[in-house]
Amino acid sequence: MTPRLRRRGALLVSVLASVVLLSSCGGQTAATPHQQQAQAHVDVDTAALRAIKQRAGVEACPTPEGHGPVRGGMPAVTLPCLGGGNPVDLAKLRGPLVVNLFAQWCGPCRAELPYYQKLHEQGRGKVAVLGIDYQDTLPAGALQLAKATGVTYPLLADPTAQLRVPFRVRGLPGVVLVDAHGRVVHEELTEVGSYQQLRQMVQRYLHVAL
């Protein structure tokens, strides 16, 4: 093999390794200035989005009142309700609560959404479920995904990735569990592989049997 061919072969191996590494990432990388500007102008409350939300049957966002931030609780970040509704101060949320970080561009998220919906249905009155559409510039796509997968639990939007630092988000999907006192008792960036896995997580960390 000539030196030129060896160099080409080494370059090809390097490129292929980079492709494999990127394909294994669960989420988007840090946004460029152009992407950040686009994310900052994402409107998550329009007449069209409200119509999609209504057709999908997505419930209204929670309105936590009378609570303040707690040590070890959710971050003091206020997010808009996807498809219209009251914004929510995450620091005021109380559980038992399961928060799902997802996006319409995330393949694994699509697969696990039905498990969260089943938890929403079977855990009604015992544990609440809340979705957060993370770093997503296509809110209509997120609501259409909710409709396609049967999701009806409340959905917030974080198009500018305000939760990147508090939750150390490097990829999606993610799950956060909040107890009755508002404390985050468990968080991980992982795909839930089954409803059984999600149910066991709720029982272990929130002490709620379903």
Task: Give residue ranges: language-model regions.
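A short beta-strand-turn-helix
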Residues: 69-71, 76-97
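Thiol/disulfide oxidoreductase modules built on the thioredoxin-like
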Residues: 144-151, 159-210
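N-terminal targeting signals for export/organelle localization
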Residues: 1-80, 210
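Structural microenvironment flanking redox-active thiols in thiol-disulfide oxidoreductases
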Residues: 110-149, 159-165
